[in-house]
Amino acid sequence: MASNTTVPVITPLAHPEGSKLDFGATVSGVDIENLTDRDFAILRTALFTHQVLVIKSQSHVSPRAQYELTQRFDPLAAPLYGHGNTDSGSVGSKSILHPDLKTIPHQPQVQVIGNGFVPTYEGLSNIQLRHPHHRTFHSTSIPASHDLTHTRFYRWHIDAALYGGVARAPPVVTTLLAVKVPQGRRQTCVYDDGTGDELDVPLGTTAFVSGYKMYDILSETQKAFARSTRVEYAPHPYVWMSSAKSRSTGLGLVSEGKEMPMEELPEIEEDRIQILPMCWRNPVTGKLALQVHPSAVRRLHLEDGTVVEDLKEVREIVYGLQRPGIAPGLVYAHDWEEGDLVIFHNRGTLHSVVGAFAESEVRLFRQCNIAGSEFPMGPEEEEKEEELVHAEQEEGVVEVTKQESLPELRMGAVEVGVAA
């Protein structure tokens, strides 16, 4: 346990020489079970600065403490699991997410994921976990004879329901705790898109890419397009895409007309369809991230009022913007060890399951994310906030510096209120 005089130490991850990776950090000297306001403030700033935080030796952290940590990043959020319905009802059972999740009975915001048979864990009995395999989702697959040596990115995504209005806004963070991790093998992750791109990865890695880097490497023309475009997501997206297949890179779907027709989906409420900015602004650094869930996109709303409705065209546009950002040199493939607690900024990164396990290899993880209390800030939000600050300064209503923007002040007030 860290003493109350210990200050958490944030250390940027050491990436391989020549790597273009510039995100991720380790945290030491923090007690998650007894997290002080001071230490959480350090964690919060570190997360929005580094996007992925790794805290070692956290096997003792309870599901409740994991949930409380996760919600602390968005204290106004309702205690709802970020992906929405995961039950066995008609909606949940059709979702592509349904087979991969087991809910902890006494902490329903926390899910158990992994691979293999687990006799008992946290109130669950006889759990059969299934690590997603690209063969079930991609339009093409690696030969079975290469299954244990080669793999693919399963599905690049953001953790989000993407339907349900603001009540199901994308989670701010996701936390992952490694309970049991198979060791000993590495695999070659292949892109199979004609580029020859591949990446050496640890078995069962979680791969991360930075939405900020994905935006930064765009041309100026592409950046202007991304800043001014809004993405409309399909209603009930994980049911809608349930029969569709992915590109070999895991970055979006191929267009074969296999999406579930709108009339066959569960009831659609138009005001619950989410239309979000293509770029999301970091609440601490102000930087823009290219944040699109490529598998769930349906339409693009352009600055001039044009709506791109041809699904194949929509996907090609999004793929052209995102594909450079998943180049091998830009992917952080975390090498999991038992007890690793990873906190990642879900509004500033994309991530993917990777790997193919033998049936006997047991992998057990806890995942927690909570639907956001409000939608992410878009590119225009900073300008609006700066205009508001300027106007209020002129009227003598409030006096703040550029560094003390209104979103920051509001967040600070919320945190103090919760702590009290």
From Swiss-Prot:
SUPFAM superfamilies, per database record: Clavaminate synthase-like (SSF51197)
Compartments where located = Cytoplasm, Cytosol
Instruction: Give the InterPro entries listed for this entry.
Output: TauD-like_sf, TauD/TfdA-like, TfdA_dioxygenase
| Annotated positions binding Fe cation | H157, D159, H351
| Entry EC number(s) | 1.14.11.48
Write the protein's name: Alpha-ketoglutarate-dependent xanthine dioxygenase xan-1
| Role of this protein | Alpha-ketoglutarate-dependent xanthine dioxygenase is a non-heme mononuclear Fe(2+) enzyme that decarboxylates alpha-ketoglutarate to succinate and CO(2) while hydroxylating xanthine to generate uric acid. Allows xanthine utilization as a nitrogen source.
Q: What is the lineage of its organism?
A: Eukaryota, Fungi, Dikarya, Ascomycota, Pezizomycotina
Q: List cofactor names only.
A: Fe(2+)
